Amino acid sequence: MKRIGAKKKPVYRIVVTDSRSRRDGAVIEEIGFYDPRANTEKGLPEVTLDVEAARRWLSHGARPSETVQGLLKRAQVYASPSSSTPDSD
């Protein structure tokens, strides 16, 4: 997520970036927008997401941050990897 917005009023762009880049550094592709302070009827934050782009990047091995992972789950784009621990007998 790339932080934009005014002081004490954060707004974020959901972006694809190289893991070695800074938080607000070089961006490969912008795939969404997140406003945690937006006033909506249900009291949920405003999220705009390009679902096709998100699925494409996840299929290519992109790893979302914890926050973006939660947003993707809410949009039903991301499913948690199942635990691969064997059952004990």
Swiss-Prot record:
GO CC entries: cytoplasm; small ribosomal subunit
Cited InterPro entries: Ribosomal_bS16, Ribosomal_bS16_dom_sf
Domain of life from the UniProt record: Bacteria
Keywords: Ribonucleoprotein, Ribosomal protein
SUPFAM superfamilies in alphabetical order: Ribosomal protein S16 (SSF54565)
Any one biological process term the GO annotation gives: translation
An example Gene Ontology molecular-function term: structural constituent of ribosome
Short name of any one Pfam family annotated for the protein: Ribosomal_S16
Entry's family note: Belongs to the bacterial ribosomal protein bS16 family.
Name assigned to this protein: Small ribosomal subunit protein bS16
Protein species of origin: Gloeobacter violaceus (strain ATCC 29082 / PCC 7421)
